Amino acid sequence: MIHGYANSGRKNNRMNQEITNILKAYEKALNTSDTRAALALYGSGPVFMPQFSVALSGRDAVRAAYDKIFQTITLNVIFTIHEIVEMGDLAYVRTSSAGETKIHATNKMVRESNNELFIFRKEQGQWKIHRYLFASTNPPATA
């Protein structure tokens, strides 16, 4: 369930709804640990920049990253859209997400909270995730 919405760029309700729908599908893919569904939302040359990792370029690297993530954790998060800005065939979206993460190795539930930046690009008339970066808003764990 996506919350919130603000548009500080050029007004284009169709684009905003298309991108909002992609983010809803992405949220669902994360919450169902569905690599195939997540990857379907990415374009032909994606770059995924998860926290504490090098940038992962290309569909094979992004697929492998999601497979590894979903083997390690199960997410239960809700995204909030703060801003969508269109610039021709590119758009950027600033979001935050919050919820819980189950860590498979320990079977522990921990709080999940992130800021995200998505860059979308139109490919064959469809918006696709082109670049994606996230960083936790939780304080670092103390020893």
Model regions and ranges:
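A beta-strand edge to alpha-helix "cap/lid" segment located at domain peripheries
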Residues: 5, 9-37, 47-143
